[in-house]
Structures are given as C-alpha cells and as structure tokens.
Regions:
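Transmembrane alpha-helical segments in integral membrane proteins
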Residues: 68-86, 155-172
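Alpha-helical transmembrane segments and their helix-start/interface "positive-inside/aromatic belt" motifs
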Residues: 2-20, 60-64, 92-107, 239-243
Length: 260
C-alpha cells in the first residue's frame, strides 16, 4: 500500500483535490437541469427516476455521487495517460499561456453568446431563450463554471482525449518513442465529436426533438468549441482548457444578462 501511495502520489493528490469540486459540480448541474429541461420531457424523465429513487433528494445525492466517482476515475487515469503522452504540465497558471488563453476565450464567449440571436431566431419556439434564461440562475452560473469548465474538461480532454491519443499511438505508431502530433490532433477531433454527441440527451430535453438545425447547433456549439479546448490542453495543459471553458460561459452569460 505504501509503495502504491508513493508511486502514484502525484495523480492521487491531483484527483483528491478535484473531488470537492466534483461533488459541488454534480449537485449544481442537476439543479440546473431541473430548471432547464422542457417540462413535458422532464416530467417523464423525473417520473421514471423518482419511481426508482423515491425522491428528488435521493436523485441529487445519486447524481452527486456519480459525478464524484467519474471524477475519481477520470482524474487518476487521465493524469497517468497525460503523463505518458507528455501532456501533463504542472498544475499552475503562467503568464504567457494565461494571456493567450484569455485572448482566445474572450472572443469565444462572444461567439457562444450569439446563439441567442442566431439559432434563437432561426429555430421555432423559445427553447434557446429558455435555455439562456435558465443559465442565468445561480444554478446555471455555478454549474457552467464548475461542471462545464472543470468536470467536462476533466472527462473529455484529460481522460477521453488522452485515452484516444494513447490508443492511437500504441496501435498505429508503437515504434515511435513519443506520440506523433497528428495522433493527438486526431484524438482532439474525435473527443470533440463525442463531446458534442454527449450533449444530445440534453438537447432533446431542451428542444423536445432532434431536427437537422438542432443537430447542427449541438455539434457546432459543443464540437467546435471543444476543438479549441483540446488544442489548449495539448499546447499548455489541462488547466488552460478548464479556464477557457469557464471563461466562455462567464462571458456569454454576462452578455445575455446585459443585452438579452
């Protein structure tokens, strides 16, 4: 046991530091979803869940615990994979990468906010406006920063993108001592597509259905921005992907608060 703790001290410390954030993020995102989803869809979903769990409090507890478990697994193994790939950097912010990340993230937040005035106009109904309004609640702000900014980057970039890159390296370029850049880029693209696909259930919850324009919105907003987060992870470290994702949400929500 002592040997294990000594050998894996760094990934264990990293993972343990994230668990309180994971607990808060898991609780907040469920609170946010309860305010966000289309009432008819939510009623059916909740009815099925509550029939199994018994109460909203249990639903919140289970959802929170689930996020903590995912964070523990993805944090620990993601750290190890990132180390093998040469992508794990000291978990601190440095001036030049920080400024470059902010220079990218502030315009991204502006672009993301345009969803309200583009797809919000082009798509029938008021689902986009309702989603934006729900995001301006306390639950929406906090879950966007902690779950979107930290947890989603932990799951999708540190773990999934690293796993895909590691598999691509070992399966197709095993003779290379270091993973080729093209493998990591391909892993970023695939992880971004899977990140967007992972938002399809939430998209159905918001819009009640999937149409071609709704699918375009889902993959453009999530997959497109996911590529940027993945590049920041590859260039500077996972903390900059987390920061960029969080800043995107903060900027877009500030714009909606002032102008929408």
């Amino acid at each position: 046991m002592r040997k294990f703790l000594t050998q894996y001290r760094a990934p264990l410390r990293f993972t343990l530091a994230l668990l309180p954030v994971a607990a808060a993020a898991g609780y907040l995102v469920i609170r946010y979803q309860l305010a966000l989803y289309d009432p008819a869809t939510l009623a059916a979903t909740l009815a099925a869940m509550l029939a199994q769990l018994g109460s909203t409090a249990v639903l919140l507890a289970v959802g929170t615990a689930q996020t903590v478990v995912y964070a523990a697994v993805c944090g620990f193994f993601g750290y190890l994979l990132a180390e093998k790939l040469g992508l794990m950097r000291p978990f601190r912010l440095e001036k030049r990468p920080l400024l470059r990340t902010l220079a990218v993230s502030l315009p991204l937040g502006l672009l993301f906010s345009l969803d309200y005035w583009t797809f919000g106009v082009w798509l029938p109904g008021t689902a986009v406006q309702t989603s934006a309004a729900a995001g301006l609640t306390v639950w929406g702000w906090l879950s966007a920063i902690l779950y979107g900014g930290v947890m989603e980057e932990l799951f999708m970039r540190l773990f999934l993108m690293s796993l895909l890159a590691f598999l691509g390296w070992r399966l197709f370029f095993r003779r290379e001592k270091q993973p080729p850049t093209r493998v990591i880029v391909a892993a970023n693209v695939l992880a971004a597509l899977l990140f967007a696909a992972g938002h399809l259930p939430a998209t159905v919850g918001i819009f009640g259905t999937l149409t071609p324009p709704v699918l375009v919105r889902c993959f453009l907003l999530n997959g497109g921005f996911g590529l940027v987060f993945g590049r920041l992870y590859r260039r500077y470290g996972i903390q900059y992907a987390m920061l960029s994702h969080a800043v995107l949400h903060i900027v877009s929500k500030l714009i909606w608060t002032i102008f929408a």
